[in-house]
Amino acid sequence: MARVKSGKTNRARHKKVLKRAKGYYSAGSRAYIHAVEKNDRGMAFAYRDRKVNKRNFRTLWNQRINAAARLNGTTYSRLIGGLIKAGIQVDRKILADLAINDAAAFTALCKHALA
């Protein structure tokens, strides 16, 4: 039986890893061993930062809602508490968007929440 070597398989695997490693500094984009490590770290950072991104956006929305609420004579916590008591279910993303793009609607929500 003929000896089976893995040249074709290895070449394909190396090409795939080096293609993903484009743009990395120095040997990180040229040497297979370094490219594997860079790819692993890059994927770990990407996984972590997908979670962090959600946190950052929620913080940004809360800050925007608080700033708009203070323009309407209340605070973020009083506004959110009032909305919950009034039974108005609007998520923070929509509230922040209203605060920036439709101040009249946000003011109306504030009045309902504080009534």
Swiss-Prot record:
SUPFAM superfamilies: Ribosomal protein L20. One of its GO terms (molecular function) is structural constituent of ribosome. Binds directly to 23S ribosomal RNA and is necessary for the in vitro assembly process of the 50S ribosomal subunit. It is not involved in the protein synthesizing functions of that subunit. PANTHER family: 39S RIBOSOMAL PROTEIN L20 (PTHR10986). CDD domains: Ribosomal_L20. GO terms for cellular component: ribonucleoprotein complex; ribosome. Belongs to the bacterial ribosomal protein bL20 family. PROSITE patterns: RIBOSOMAL_L20. It comes from Bdellovibrio bacteriovorus (strain ATCC 15356 / DSM 50701 / NCIMB 9529 / HD100). Gene3D superfamilies: 6.10.160.10, Ribosomal protein L20. Keywords: Ribonucleoprotein, Ribosomal protein, RNA-binding, rRNA-binding. GO terms for biological process: ribosomal large subunit assembly; translation. This is Large ribosomal subunit protein bL20. Pfam families: Ribosomal_L20.
